[in-house]
């Protein structure tokens, strides 16, 4: 999401205020303060030919620049504090202005403006002592004002936590649910639950603790990804393309309250270009990201704005990520 | 009727042929039918392979064999595959068995009756291990499914005459015949990452095609009722197990019945009456013979009745149980 108007700049300031951390004045405007993605380098252990993350997390800014996040941990740790061969936790808000990560040294989760400035250290309880940061993943809301700390511990002991950054307030969501992400305004979290009867239920959790849930048809349950709009009920459903069958990815719109499902449209993308991230913008348009380039080759990320009525896709951004990467996270992921 | 690599069985066809049973009035008089067919396994040159003849284990406790049946599958060119098991299937009522003869022909034998050897060109020339047989509950119909890389149509035969009745598209998973053998049910991966169910007439005409709800698609396999449109499937979940009835024509779940099932993994599901679904449940206890429990579910009430249970021959390499 880009802020180009004066009003948007004001909005951005408001959000920064809401974050409760002081932005450096020089970075309070659009431009270099927005980041597209973060990545971390790979190194190879020649003894056993395994790879591991090394160096610092790097930010790729909207204007093509680079920033290094020196205090972000390179790797995760387990419950005994041992470093693992998985990249440290990292997330970027949908608007590219806020980052959250696992801090080197104490492995606490922190949040700050992408452009720089002081960090806000979040509650120590977000990292379960039993497991360290290893089962966790971080997701920032589109405006960076809320953080989702999802846990994939096998025993489903650790609840998902939603942190309102300005206040530090933590809301817990059921450990057995897996998280799809925030709604556009950050007001809801879309989750899914795998039921004992092998079906999957979609659930939108609201901030007030209430929720809307429905067990959808196969096409929604088997989709590549879902994205919740600001209204907390409209779900964009992206269906995988199939290169072998020469079928392009499709889009359907699902209403979580009524169960209504649109007939769907083909997206004007190639069969192999199944988006791996979809986000509704505040004005009701849908943005999708397509990534190409396997491990060991340069990753190219393309951003498209999709017309939900026709499936027409307009490329709005394109950037690459080094082939030396171990892992990367894009804004809004 | 599916061949399960893991366990096996044997039976004595010869014994069956010698002792024809007179009473055939009851379609499900299992007492004179085959419970299952099994072949032993042994290790030759370090490789596991089937050994000896197919053994037919009868409800009466008798044991027969199928001396004219191939146990080791042949390649498309007729040479032995040495290690692969040749296909076999037992009808739901246990009265008929389909197999390849030693001379490579398709055959269906009736317990206490004769054997129908099919025409040489009844089946396409493919490796026998790429062929799966399924018989209808009464054994009157045979479907031959080909798991070749290139999709080959499934062929449907009348087992009394050997006549080819029709074919259904290749590349689909055949789930089985309807209760009366008049239709077939298949499952296929469709566009948009969903699984569809399709009902065909025995002549290969598509009757219904539906994208069922998750609770059906995610708890495969389904079985088709005699009406050719109602399916049954089971959600296996211990105390929370349920039978799900689904109408392909209206795309509606008709009923969900809580069912109390004995232990075991689902091996087969078949309609065996207008209000009856039969399950084969198998257990694989470590170091012991596999156990089969067969239950009948009343589709109206969900009441479960154990029809039969037995331990499979411990030396079974592969077995094929009757379906109904």
Description of each model-found segment:
Chain A
Residues 29-35, 89-98, 102-103, 137-146, ...:
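Blade-terminus and WD-like Trp-Asp/Gly-His loop motifs, strongest in beta-propeller folds
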Residues 221-225, 237-241:
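Short secondary-structure capping micro-motifs at structural edges
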Residues 1-30:
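Secretory targeting and sorting signals
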Residues 74-77, 84-87, 124-132, 170, ...:
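Short coil/turn segments at the loop-to-beta-strand junctions that recur within blades
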Residues 135-138, 304:
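Hydrophobic/aromatic beta-strand elements that line small-molecule binding cavities or substrate pockets
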Residues 79-116:
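Post-signal peptide N-terminal segment of secreted/secretory-pathway proteins
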Residues 49-75, 104-128, 145-174, 187-189, ...:
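Beta-propeller blade-edge and WD-like acidic-aromatic loop motif
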Residues 28-94, 319-333:
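Extracytoplasmic low-complexity, Pro/Thr/Ser/Ala/Gly-rich segments
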């Amino acid at each position: 999401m880009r802020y180009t108007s004066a009003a948007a700049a004001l909005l951005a300031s408001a959000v920064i205020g809401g974050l409760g951390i002081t932005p450096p004045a020089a970075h309070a405007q659009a431009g270099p303060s927005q980041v597209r993605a973060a990545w971390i380098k790979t190194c190879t252990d020649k003894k056993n030919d395994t790879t591991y993350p090394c160096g610092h997390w790097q930010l790729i800014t909207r204007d093509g620049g680079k920033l290094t996040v020196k205090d972000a941990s390179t790797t995760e740790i387990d419950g005994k504090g041992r470093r693992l061969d998985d990249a440290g936790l990292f997330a970027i808000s949908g608007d590219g202005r806020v980052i959250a990560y696992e801090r080197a040294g104490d492995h606490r989760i922190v949040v700050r403006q992408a452009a720089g400035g002081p960090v806000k250290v979040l509650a120590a309880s977000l990292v379960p002592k039993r497991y360290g940061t290893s089962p966790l993943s971080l997701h920032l809301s589109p405006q960076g004002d809320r953080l989702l700390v999802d846990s994939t511990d096998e025993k489903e002991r650790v609840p998902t936590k939603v942190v309102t950054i300005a206040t530090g307030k933590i809301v817990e969501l059921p450990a057995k649910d897996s998280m799809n992400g925030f709604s556009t305004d950050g007001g809801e979290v879309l989750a899914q639950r795998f039921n004992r009867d092998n079906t999957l239920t979609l659930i939108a959790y609201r901030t007030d603790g209430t929720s809307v849930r429905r067990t959808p048809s196969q096409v929604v349950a088997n989709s590549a990804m879902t994205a919740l709009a600001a209204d907390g009920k409209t779900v964009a459903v992206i269906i995988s393309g199939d290169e072998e069958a020469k079928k392009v990815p499709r889009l359907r719109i699902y209403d979580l309250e009524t169960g209504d499902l649109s007939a769907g449209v083909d997206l004007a993308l190639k069969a192999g270009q199944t988006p791996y991230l979809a986000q509704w913008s505040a004005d009701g348009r849908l943005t999708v990201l397509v990534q190409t380039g396997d491990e060991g080759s340069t990753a190219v990320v393309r951003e498209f704005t999709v017309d939900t009525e026709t499936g027409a896709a307009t490329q709005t951004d394109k950037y690459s990520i080094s082939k030396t990467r171990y892992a990367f996270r894009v804004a809004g992921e | 009727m599916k061949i399960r690599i893991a366990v096996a069985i044997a039976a004595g066809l010869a014994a069956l042929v010698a002792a024809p049973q007179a009473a055939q009035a009851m379609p499900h008089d299992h007492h004179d039918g085959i419970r299952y067919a099994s072949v032993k396994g042994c290790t030759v040159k370090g490789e596991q392979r089937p050994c000896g003849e197919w053994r037919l284990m009868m409800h009466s406790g008798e044991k027969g064999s199928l001396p004219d049946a191939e146990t080791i599958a042949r390649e498309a060119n007729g040479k032995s595959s040495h290690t692969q098991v040749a296909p076999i299937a037992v009808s739901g009522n246990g009265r008929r068995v389909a197999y390849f003869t030693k001379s490579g022909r398709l055959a269906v034998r009736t317990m206490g009756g004769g054997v129908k050897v099919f025409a040489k060109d009844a089946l396409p020339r493919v490796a026998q291990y790429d062929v799966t047989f399924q018989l209808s509950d009464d054994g009157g119909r045979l479907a031959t499914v080909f798991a070749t890389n290139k999709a080959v149509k499934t062929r449907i035969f009348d087992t009394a005459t050997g006549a080819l009745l029709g074919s259904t598209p290749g590349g689909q998973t055949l789930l089985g015949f309807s209760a009366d053998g008049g239709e077939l049910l298949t499952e296929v991966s469709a566009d948009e990452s969903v699984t569809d169910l399709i009902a065909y007439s025995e002549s290969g005409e598509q009757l219904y095609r539906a994208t069922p709800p998750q609770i059906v698609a995610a708890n495969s396999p389904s079985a088709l009722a005699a009406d050719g449109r109602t399916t049954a499937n089971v959600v296996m979940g211990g105390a929370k197990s349920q039978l799900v009835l689904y109408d392909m024509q209206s795309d509606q779940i008709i009923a969900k019945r809580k069912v109390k099932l004995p232990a075991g993994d689902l091996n087969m599901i078949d309609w065996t009456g207008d209000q009856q679904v039969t399950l084969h449940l198998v257990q694989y206890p470590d170091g012991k013979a596999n156990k089969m429990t067969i239950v009948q579910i009343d589709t109206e009430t969900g009441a479960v009745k154990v029809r039969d249970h037995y331990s499979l021959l411990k030396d079974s390499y592969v077995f094929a149980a009757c379906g109904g």
